[in-house]
Amino acid sequence: MEELEQGLLMQPWAWLQLAENSLLAKVFITKQGYALLVSDLQQVWHEQVDTSVVSQRAKELNKRLTAPPAAFLCHLDNLLRPLLKDAAHPSEATFSCDCVADALILRVRSELSGLPFYWNFHCMLASPSLVSQHLIRPLMGMSLALQCQVRELATLLHMKDLEIQDYQESGATLIRDRLKTEPFEENSFLEQFMIEKLPEACSIGDGKPFVMNLQDLYMAVTTQEVQVGQKHQGAGDPHTSNSASLQGIDSQCVNQPEQLVSSAPTLSAPEKESTGTSGPLQRPQLSKVKRKKPRGLFS
């Protein structure tokens, strides 16, 4: 199950708007099973299953359908991908959720080969270590990365001020007065930000701003966490290990026929090609920015 655990960690969060409420969710599906993490910003629920659980649950919920577990997993991936990846193209399935004691049940209803298809994700409260792995540690890493970014930008602004000062000392004057700026004072800027911008900037709401604006950074931080963990475990080259182990359903379900057999006579399902909810992940790459020459604001 290590593949599912690492694959889930490196997935972005998605924002789900259901009839009952809104949720944050991430999922990783392969031919061997799936892992799902869901949160309403109050609690976090988790489910991770293998093919044996998929097969048993499919029999209980869909008595008229018979298929290998991989076919059901591919179908679930096809249903979840529009919901998690592209809100502009809604899923053909209907989703609803219920909270029962410490469990959250995410119910799915759709059609498969002309017959109703049902699925229930049975998510239990996530362990503290799982919450730390997927939320606390990544969010701390993101905060440190953003702080470092702010310091780099402040340094760049100071360098720009020195450059402008050098132009002025050389006798240059500003042609357009509207472009005039005061020297950057970091402490004053931070104090003003705390007073004027902080309330709006840290408005969490239902979690949608976090999902819409920060997932690239989130995935970069979690990818780094996985690579560091692999180095500590002596797993060899993390790039090689990641590309081999985190293919997900893209590599395992391509050209996977559903091979469905119904209790109704002469019913067969068309073959489908599916790609994974979590395809091959592109690691963030940093490129050097070529500094541009001044455009002659001064003459």
Swiss-Prot record:
Residues 255-299 are annotated as: Disordered. Changing residue 65 to D: Abolished ability to repair double-strand breaks (DSBs). Abolished ability to participate in V(D)J recombination. Decreased interaction with XRCC4. Phosphorylated by PRKDC at the C-terminus in response to DNA damage. Phosphorylations by PRKDC at the C-terminus of XRCC4 and NHEJ1/XLF are highly redundant and regulate ability of the XRCC4-NHEJ1/XLF subcomplex to bridge DNA. Phosphorylation does not prevent interaction with XRCC4 but disrupts ability to bridge DNA and promotes detachment from DNA. Residues 255-266 have a biased composition (Polar residues). GO terms for cellular component: DNA ligase IV complex; DNA-dependent protein kinase-DNA ligase 4 complex; fibrillar center; nonhomologous end joining complex; nucleoplasm; nucleus; site of double-strand break. Pfam families: XLF, XLF_CC. Residues 224-288 are annotated as: C-terminal tail. Changing residue 174 to A: Impaired ability to repair double-strand breaks (DSBs). Does not affect interaction with XRCC4. Changing residue 57 to G: In IMD124; likely pathogenic; fails to translocate to the nucleus; decreased ability to repair double-strand breaks (DSBs); impaired ability to participate in V(D)J recombination. Changing residue 251 to D: In XLF-Asp mutant; phospho-mimetic mutant; abolished ability to bridge DNA. The keyword Ribosomal protein does not apply. Changing residue 203 to D: In XLF-Asp mutant; phospho-mimetic mutant; abolished ability to bridge DNA. Ubiquitously expressed. Residues 128-170 form a coiled coil. Changing residue 43 to A: Does not affect ability to participate in V(D)J recombination. Changing residue 115 to D: Impaired ability to repair double-strand breaks (DSBs). Abolished ability to bridge DNA. Abolished ability to participate in V(D)J recombination. Abolished interaction with XRCC4. Changing residue 179 to A: Impaired ability to repair double-strand breaks (DSBs). Does not affect interaction with XRCC4. GO terms for molecular function: DNA end binding; DNA polymerase binding. Residues 1-135 are annotated as: Globular head. Gene3D superfamilies: DNA double-strand break repair and VJ recombination XRCC4, N-terminal, Helix hairpin bin. DNA repair protein involved in DNA non-homologous end joining (NHEJ); it is required for double-strand break (DSB) repair and V(D)J recombination and is also involved in telomere maintenance. Plays a key role in NHEJ by promoting the ligation of various mismatched and non-cohesive ends. Together with PAXX, collaborates with DNA polymerase lambda (POLL) to promote joining of non-cohesive DNA ends. May act in concert with XRCC5-XRCC6 (Ku) to stimulate XRCC4-mediated joining of blunt ends and several types of mismatched ends that are non-complementary or partially complementary. Was named 'Cernunnos' after the enigmatic Celtic god of hunting, the underworld and fertility. This is Non-homologous end-joining factor 1.
